[in-house]
Amino acid sequence: MAKKAGSKLPKRKEEFTYRGYRVSELAKMRLEEIAELLPSRQRRTLRRGLSKEHRKFMAKLRARGTAKTHLRDAIVLPEMVGKVVEIHNGKTFQRVEIIPEMIGHYLGEYALTRARVIHGAAGVGATRSSKFVPLK
């Protein structure tokens, strides 16, 4: 069978690059080199150095491939890509798989702390007109 001239082929997903570097290239870089590619707020944070808690979290993530954390201010680094992190949102841990598009963002951005409020129907006496509605 011949293909139609107007039929479209499925698009191939392009490989993700961060500032012109592939994830495999970023993973080989030192922390100082990665910091130079990040936005200024994240760059300043990394220049100050990782805290003891951050280093402990990264070691746990390297060893197991998954880790629970309360460190919402941790920056997603290239070595975290493909790992699963459970981020605390103030009540529970939300499971998040790190993908390349998350590099340079904070972990807290992916575990929302506030839920959308969904109100139920108003009860009897909630409004002035509902006072005269007969009860069942």
Curated annotation (Swiss-Prot):
Q: Which InterPro entries match?
A: Ribosomal_uS19 (IPR002222), Ribosomal_uS19_CS (IPR020934), Ribosomal_uS19_euk/arc (IPR005713), Ribosomal_uS19_SF (IPR023575)
One of the GO BP terms on file: ribosomal small subunit assembly
Listed A to Z, the keywords are: Ribonucleoprotein, Ribosomal protein, RNA-binding, rRNA-binding
GO CC aspect terms = cytosolic small ribosomal subunit
Q: Which PROSITE patterns match?
A: RIBOSOMAL_S19
State if Nucleotide-binding is listed as a keyword: no
Described purpose of this protein according to its UniProt entry: Protein S19 forms a complex with S13 that binds strongly to the 16S ribosomal RNA.
NCBIfam families cross-referenced by the UniProt entry: PRK04038.1, uS19_arch
Q: Give the protein family.
A: Belongs to the universal ribosomal protein uS19 family.
Spell out the protein name for this chain.
Small ribosomal subunit protein uS19
The record lists the organism as Methanothrix thermoacetophila (strain DSM 6194 / JCM 14653 / NBRC 101360 / PT)
The root-end lineage is: Archaea, Methanobacteriati, Methanobacteriota, Stenosarchaea group, Methanomicrobia
